[in-house]
């Protein structure tokens, strides 16, 4: 059975880009007779906004979204992540890293998603002394191409060794890294389809590699076009994207429907009616492949 999900981070309030992702993932799930889960990705407390998680859920309800089951909170799922890391440790796929960021980024080259880790701590003889600090844990990546067929973008591939390097699963400050948590959650929740923004396209080969290491299914992926401002920057909390105005719910839903190349939506009394209409008219093949500049 199709199981999709929407996984916001409570580092701020929902904005127009969030609404596009929620609407597209919801329409794809419901049009396929599937479930739509909501998962709160609250892995990084220092960056989170007090009250944002509750505000996000209230906003989704106000826009007519209905999710299946209880909301999952990553902050309550640490035991799952510990079990997942233990499996990788037992398999000899991960190692402790005592490098500071300055240690390994000095002289490092840029790859697909920041600097490529130089592998200094792969060899136990070359690891810096712990100096009483907890290590990060990294996973060894293969020198081979990992690719997949995306439902919107088409073919996408990376050589993890050359483009990314061994990446962190547990940070030295004790917080779980996104890549491990999202793979563990998707597997445990039975997620079969992931519809999300193209900013996460670069993360997908890492997640597929983790899925292979853990022998769990790889979902089908579809990465949505990003909404950008006049300067070409992705609308986000960092670029001061305004929070969704609950007094303009129908107007904002019609706006994201246009971005997704849906037909012109009819008048409706409630946002839920507009979402039902979007489900009935959903066509992934018509979703644009490239970024969309918005006012």
From Swiss-Prot:
Binding site for Zn(2+): 97, 99, 117, 121
Keyword Isomerase: no
Function text: Catalyzes the tRNA-independent activation of glutamate in presence of ATP and the subsequent transfer of glutamate onto a tRNA(Asp). Glutamate is transferred on the 2-amino-5-(4,5-dihydroxy-2-cyclopenten-1-yl) moiety of the queuosine in the wobble position of the QUC anticodon.
GO molecular function: ATP binding; glutamate-tRNA ligase activity; zinc ion binding
Motif 'HIGH' region per UniProt: ranges: 8-18
Protein name: Glutamyl-Q tRNA(Asp) synthetase
Binding positions for ATP per the UniProt entry: 237
Protein encoded by which gene: gluQ
Enzyme Commission code(s) on record: 6.1.1.-
Motif stretch ('KMSKS' region): 234-238
UniProt record similarity statement: Belongs to the class-I aminoacyl-tRNA synthetase family. GluQ subfamily.
The species this protein was found in: Neisseria meningitidis serogroup A / serotype 4A (strain DSM 15465 / Z2491)
A GO cellular component entry from the record: cytosol
Keywords: Aminoacyl-tRNA synthetase, ATP-binding, Ligase, Metal-binding, Nucleotide-binding, Zinc
Cited SUPFAM superfamilies: Nucleotidylyl transferase
Lineage: Bacteria, Pseudomonadati, Pseudomonadota, Betaproteobacteria, Neisseriales
Binding site residues for L-glutamate: 5-9, 41, 178, 196
């Amino acid at each position: 059975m199709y199981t999709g999900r929407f996984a916001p981070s409570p580092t701020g309030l929902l904005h127009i880009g969030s609404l596009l992702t929620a609407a597209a993932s919801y329409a794809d799930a419901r049009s396929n007779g599937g479930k739509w889960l909501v998962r709160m990705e609250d892995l990084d407390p220092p960056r989170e906004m007090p009250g944002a998680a509750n505000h996000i859920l209230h906003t989704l309800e106000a826009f007519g979204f209905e999710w299946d089951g209880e909301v999952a909170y990553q902050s309550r799922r640490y035991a799952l992540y510990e079990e997942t890391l233990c499996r990788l440790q037992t398999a000899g796929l991960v190692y402790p890293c005592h490098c500071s960021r300055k240690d390994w980024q000095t002289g490092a080259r840029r790859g697909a998603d920041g600097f490529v880790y130089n592998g200094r701590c792969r060899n136990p003889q070359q690891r810096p002394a712990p100096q009483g600090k907890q290590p990060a844990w990294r996973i060894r990546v293969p020198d081979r191409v990992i690719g997949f067929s995306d439902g919107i973008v088409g073919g996408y591939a990376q050589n993890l060794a050359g483009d990314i390097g061994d990446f962190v699963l547990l940070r030295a400050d004790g917080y779980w890294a996104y890549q491990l948590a999202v793979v563990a959650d998707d597997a445990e929740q039975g997620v079969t389809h992931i519809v999300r923004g193209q900013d996460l396209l670069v993360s997908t080969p890492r997640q597929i590699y983790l899925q292979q290491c853990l022998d769990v299914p790889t979902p089908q992926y579809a990465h949505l076009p990003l909404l950008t401002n006049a300067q070409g920057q992705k609308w986000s909390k960092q670029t001061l994207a305004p929070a969704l105005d609950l007094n303009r719910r129908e107007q904002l839903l019609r706006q994201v429907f246009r971005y997704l190349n849906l037909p012109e939506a009819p008048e409706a009394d409630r946002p839920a009616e507009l979402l039902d209409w979007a489900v009935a008219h959903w066509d992934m093949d018509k979703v644009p492949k490239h970024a969309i500049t918005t006012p």
